[in-house]
Amino acid sequence: MPVKEKAALLVPSGTYHEPDKKHLHIICSDPDAKGLVVIVGISTYTNDLCDQTCVLQAHEHPWLRHQSFVLYRKAEIVSAAALQARIQSGEVLECDEVNAQTFLRIKKGLCKSPQTKRKVKRYLGC
């Protein structure tokens, strides 16, 4: 699967206690002329201190097991080629795309969230 908007990936994000843990990440843009894309992670919703911009329910993606939220503060602009290399090496795993409605909520949230970095917002034209 090529690196493109709506693609969902499982990216290594383990902790000291769970080094093999992976979190769902969503690619939020197609590669630009420089081959860059925006990617954002999804994390477990634990309390009301989590970013409320885009809260997801377990039924919104097969990988989600419980209520989650989009971790806009860690949104990044990354090289699509580097991401593709990580996929080909098996470090990053591909999974089912996000449905169109959920993806729209995630993408709109990049501009709405107060936690999205300024450089990501500028890149997206927010």
Show the residue positions of the predicted features.
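Generic structural signal for residues positioned in beta-strands
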Residues: 10, 38, 55, 69-71, ...
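Loop/turn positions that initiate beta-strands
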Residues: 5-8
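Mixed-charge, Lys/Arg-rich low-complexity intrinsically disordered regions
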Residues: 1-3
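Compact nucleic-acid interaction/catalytic patches
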Residues: 12, 17-63
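C-terminal terminal-subdomain/extension
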Residues: 60-126
